[in-house]
């Protein structure tokens, strides 16, 4: 059993690298253990991931704010605090904050994450299935 206490000092979040558009702050909640990585990620308005996929899938639990998620070939969906999202193994997808809202979620990634290209601005700003942007 492993117990990890949250960071106790300001500035312990990592600055997102080349897998994100906009300002994104990932907090490593649990280092990689048996192929499972758990992060809490804070996205500023408009911040979002690049296209990516997970070897054994990914679970997102939205803690605060409003965001967007899209699987390749599917509609953009609005996500809100309390929502849980399951991306099946190998499904190409992206997720992040709405253009006008912050978003915080916990991401539970199973297996290797394969990062791909940036989401085109026109795709990110497309109308969602709910009629929102």
Regions found by a protein language model. Give the residues of each.
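Conserved short histidine dyad/triad with adjacent acidic residue
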Residues: 23, 39-54, 89
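A short hydrophobic beta-strand segment most commonly corresponding to one strand
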Residues: 59, 86, 100-119
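A short, N-terminal "cap"/entry segment at the start of jelly-roll beta-barrel domains
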Residues: 1-36, 115-133
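Short, conserved beta-strand element in jelly-roll/cupin
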Residues: 42-44, 53-70, 108-111
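Asparagine-centered strand-capping/turn motif at beta-strand->loop junctions
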Residues: 96-98
